[in-house]
């Protein structure tokens, strides 16, 4: 699969009545910034990716990131680990990357093999270089960052603060860290592993939702279901849903497809961030942006003799 395939949305999407929230406007801003900053200081930013060859999708993800890194002016170093690697082995590799001053950003590509202790492995990455969960050493989940940037670009951030946000699924992008940050940033967030068309907001455990349940609100659905391409049909989405953000990813013979059925793109009441072309390209470009910003932090700490890189 060519990396560009994830960045562009199919022409078929444009024929529907739904409003498309495409990532290209946000990507354009980040790309321009990367071109200005990548070589500043005479040092090329380096992003290191640890991955496990769990299948064709894993290799596709590596290639897609390589394509974006080349466009951003970021060197891209890939470290393949055995699928049966132990937590200790992966931590040993992370330690080497933490200590290497040539490496500025570190990403461990999901999904991780089942035998690994994911929180321990992910938590071992130096925060300075952890481009998925930190920005300038502050906790800032990359997917939540991409979500906010997309809504801001389309003037929807303020309405999102008043909407019910239903996060459905779990996996490579919807993680515990993503859900935690979304609940910190937005008052009416609920998360579940599956998609329930009969979802009743009055049954929500989220305190803010319980207090406001009688107030009519628009709803936003964010999905990463791993139930197959086009799993969410139009009949499953209630009228009060105003925004759908598709984080599903399926590489098929027809190209990349997300969780949303094409029938949803015919609903004029919806704003949709599709796969491909919606949130996912923004995620990729934020990885590059954070790597470039981390370059300056790493250089500064090396100059000052800081020992926090020696984890």
Label each region the model flagged:
Residues 73-142, 264-267:
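Phosphate/diphosphate ligand-binding glycine-rich loop within oxidoreductases
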Residues 54-64, 138-247, 252-266:
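Glycine-rich phosphate/diphosphate-binding loop of Rossmann-like nucleotide-binding domains
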Residues 69-83, 187-200:
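Short beta-strand elements in bilobed, periplasmic/extracellular small-molecule ligand-binding domains
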Residues 51, 107-111, 168:
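Short beta-strand segments
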Residues 15, 20, 24-36, 41-47, ...:
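Adenosine-phosphate binding glycine-rich loop
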Residues 37-46, 54-71:
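N-terminal glycine-rich anion-binding loops that anchor highly charged ligand groups
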Residues 2-42, 138-153:
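Short N-terminal or domain-adjacent regulatory/targeting segments
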